[in-house]
Amino acid sequence: MFGRAGFDNQWQFPQGGINKGENHQVAALRELQEETAIHSVEHVAEYPQALRYDFPSNVLEKFKKMGRTNIGQEQYWHLFFFNGSDDEINFTSHPEEIEFNAYKWIDIMSAPELVVDFKKDVYLKVCSYFQQIIQKYIGQI
């Protein structure tokens, strides 16, 4: 899990937009690399469908003041196996937009407890699905 820069005790997985011409797996890998500098990964699985959450009213008000009009996010989820070392992680590789300032290794089923409330349901679905895949994958390596 990664701690969001500029927010006290807010944790999440890397995420971001899909550029024109990218598929969502390529976008997921690019965002992981841009936000954490992690390159030593192997794609393991993807969640079978996009998942959506809506922003709560307090977040929408902040967005409105910033000129943003989106009301939620639709996300595609990918599971990567990190086969590098912790010294690969670097949050300042793209200093123009630092997303994270901390990380911690956790059991995947702990992740839903650490995210903001409006993301919890999506994280619970994704983490429950990926937990089974992780157990099988680890048994093979």
Where in the sequence are the language-model features?
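Tryptophan-centric aromatic hotspots in well-structured domains and transmembrane helices
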Residues: W11, P48-Y53, W77, F100-I106, ...
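Active-site-adjacent beta-strand/loop module that shapes the phosphate/pyrophosphate-binding cleft
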Residues: L51-I89
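NUDIX/MutT-family hydrolases
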Residues: E74-F81, E88-V122
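N-terminal strand-loop-strand
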Residues: M1-P14, H39
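Functional cleft and adjacent loop/helix regions within the main domain
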Residues: P14, K20, E61-K65, Q140-I141
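Active-site micro-motifs of SAM-dependent methyltransferase domains
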Residues: N9, E34, E113
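The catalytic Nudix box helix
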Residues: F13-Q49
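Charge-dense polyanion-binding interfaces
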Residues: S128-I141
